[in-house]
Amino acid sequence: MIGTWHAIVETKIAKLKITFSIKDTNGEYSISAVVESFPVALDFDHVTVEGSGLRASGRAKSLQEGEAYLELIFSQNKFTGTLNIPTFGTLSLAGERGPGTSLTDLLEQELDQYRMTGVVERTEESIAAAVEQLLGQLSLQEKVGQMSQCLASDFSFGEEVASEPPEKLVAEGKAGSILGAFDINRVLELQRIAVEQSPHNIPLFFNADVIHGHQTIFPVPLAWSCSWDTEGIQRACAIAAKEASSAGITYNHGPMVDITRDPRWGRVVEGAGEDPYLGARIAEAQVRGFQGNSLFDQDTIIACLKHFIAYGAAEGGRDYNTVDISEGTLRNVHLPPFQAGIQAGAGSVMNAFNIYQGVPAAGSKFLMKDLLRNELGFDGILLSDYGAIEEISIHGCAEDEAEAARMALDATMDIEMVTRAFANQLPKLIGEGIVKEEQLDEAVRRILTYKYRIGIMDDPFRYIRPKKALECQFSEEHLQESRALARKSIVLLKNDGVLPLNASSGTVALIGPFARSKDLLGTWQFSRHGNATVTLEQGVTEAVSGRRVFIADGCAVDQPIDGGYEAALQVAEEADVIVLALGESSRMSGEAASRMNITLPEVQLKLAEEIAKLGKPTVLVLTNGRPLILDWFDRHVNAIVETWFLGSQAGHAIADVLFGQYNPSGKLTMSFPRHAGQIPVYYNHFNTGRPASQEKHFSSKYLDGSNDPLYPFGFGLSYTTFDYSEIKLDKHVLKRADSLTVQVTVANTGQAQGEEIVQLYIQDICGSVVRPVKELKGFEKVCLSPGESREIHFIITEEDLKYYAADLTFKAEAGDFKIYVGPNSRDVQEVSFRLE
């Protein structure tokens, strides 16, 4: 049994190749193991050999960490046995002597027979002709099949769905797209069935939620929105698309572009915050990143804007809850990011789970057909969210599945995600004359058009590139891009001079459940490299001598640890500076992760209180997916660093900021409330007839606290200071065909180089309906050395002043306006002008 052995194992998650190296050193056996295609670190420290059998135990690290157990029986040049490891469970092994061929090479060999050369991008005229020719050949069942999506395996993203095996559905032409094919081998397997066994050999879309990275994980979208760096966000999305497409993924279930004002809602972590203008700019950047210049490019994936529309307005911040807003709010607040994404060329849109005017979005003709398609001109693929069509009847807006399917089709829904309402009901509805086959033709026409546009109709296997995947996924280049964007996403909320820390002197105590945690990636990521996440401990110890860093967890995220507080206090006593690493676990934000109480868990608050009693310089480093209530911390710690979930390079990025290797420049895209009773609190609220006043009792205010947030939209500190000159306008009356130039000079008045995000807001003083007190209309990020100043210019035109007015027409109304410029939405200068 001495030597190298290998086995190939099929699992629900991925195909694995496990290579064992067995050695005998003076009668002591040892085993090392390498797992290919999925990073699993195996360390066997206890090996027992009896005859032709071997038993070993040790530790394994993959998506989870835990015990590993191995049993092998050898017979000449072959072996059988079992391996039990976290994430995968018990695997049956059957292998042979030798290292064998790598899975990448085996897959490339399989693909050789399918590789095509000379395939060129079709013209739109050629695509249209090909689509019509193919559409005329399809049976009703095949058309419904193109409109139906199934899961790649029995792994489920939500409630279990009764369905036939994907292999059968694909072979019979009953599925046109696949969700959740996380393994490149599975992509090949199902695509081969589609093009070799289905009636007209139509290849499949392979869909996945690539929200903030594929294998290299970037900051969660709420975090990267705080960078205000649209170019950096676009690069991150392009990298995510490159990694995903190399593994055969062609269709993304992102970006999420919902406007979010209620931090209780868990899915704020997936969006760009509370502002429509910034949300629109970031939506554009994400679409361009994912889709590139051409969807025919193999390094791109189809972008899907979600969730249309107003999902972020769920009452009480409770996921899937009722939405009850005016059409003016719908258009002025929630529509701009979708409109911008569509103008940027997004190929797909996904419906929201909520109702609008009493009708679930998935079945709303007004939302999907009248507004999205007819008014906004969207001609791409409309994809239902998971179970949304069946849920029309659960809402109580359809009597049964048949009526729900009819409503969704009438609303121009093209693809049903995973559930089977279309498959079960559309043939019968057509037979009864309730819906027309021409409606199916419209949907299938859109689907096939995109299958031609991405090139799979001419080269079905063009995206399956195992060598490319091996080369680019989690590459050093991509990790450096992740680190760069992570640094820009960090927001310094408070600093009384304790930061930056000195990397060459003094001692640091890292205390808290996130001191050495790898739970820094956030929700909606499926990276196989989670175990390689850079922790805060790693980042800090690389920045300074490891001898000067003391570490104690103190408590778990939401549970005490025996002796945890005592150990933390002992460590804190030994240090010059304390870094409190507190926050939420990744499961505490995201889908179905709403919270009533958005403070830190009680065990962490108690830990912080005990540490604060020591009176030592204390820095709070937050890991979280939403704005939190930080009023106590603002009063009791010296510095607060909001890091969100920063991704694969989180620890390095945080250390870069803590020790001054990078001057923080992030600005909040959601307001932080002082108290949960303020929620929702956002900067661009309407005025009232009785604005808040301390002098007037009968005004719109609380008796027991301020109306204002603790940290407003656009807020973020730096290690330097910036001074703003008075605002200058080139004119004070703006004619409709003209433009107005706003000028302000920003100077770095501190001692460090820094970046400032200069923000411009407008206020329409009087409209046909009440307008917000401020609206962001421009921003510019500028990097200044100490003593350096720069003139910043913004151009305002009539277009910037338009909104959906009382009659719901999009227009700018003549009258007086104010312009505000400053470092955030609160601390601004103002000047007036008039539109005529």
Residue ranges, per PLM feature:
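Central antiparallel beta-sheet cores of small beta-barrel/beta-sandwich binding domains
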Residues: 1-75, 82-94
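A glycine-anchored, Pro-Gly-centered beta-turn/N-cap motif
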Residues: 1-4, 808, 813-815
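Solvent-exposed residues in well-ordered beta-strands and their adjoining turns
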Residues: 8, 23, 36, 61, ...
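Beta-strand-rich interaction surfaces with strong enrichment in secreted/lumenal proteins
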Residues: 44-46, 69-70, 778-784, 808
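Short, structured interface segments
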Residues: 92-100, 204
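Glycoside hydrolase catalytic-domain context in secreted enzymes
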Residues: 103-802, 811-825, 834-836
